[in-house]
């Protein structure tokens, strides 16, 4: 994916961001995340983003003291829960209205950020002051991944089979490393803490190692469970 002429310059990024806390939802630089917006506070957030710089920060709420993730029955409201300190800003690149009052939007991941402090609510949605300085490399288009494709694709095939995931292998084999790693990190059913680890991996090479390890662990765990049942 090439840089868009509509993307802001790194040194012109805003000091504050609206945030959308969603557990188990991951956005990475250059990834694309479709969202169905229906709560009044997030409808207001979307309208404000459209009228401004079109940036929205995706963050995950931390698990509650009872171990539930925000949004689960018995868990805290994700709109009030404590959040992880690292998120990813997405630029609103697609927008549609529905007849029943929802917005269908797509965020394209732009750059990660560190949360410095939370600000007062605006129309019910949360805002934070952010620091971008540690993530300038997120805008680099050709970072090396160190991914061993043959080994990785072999493990991935086992993972897809065990989890009943259908895959277009021609597309997978043609995909550049970054696009493949980003897509898998965002769509695979990893736990929220695992998705946060993928987000916080410093470089693409680190993220490649994390996702390969996660898939190997999932194959070993699910595979041993299947063996035990037979």
Model-predicted segments: where are they?
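Positively charged
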Residues: 1-168, 193, 204-207, 213-230
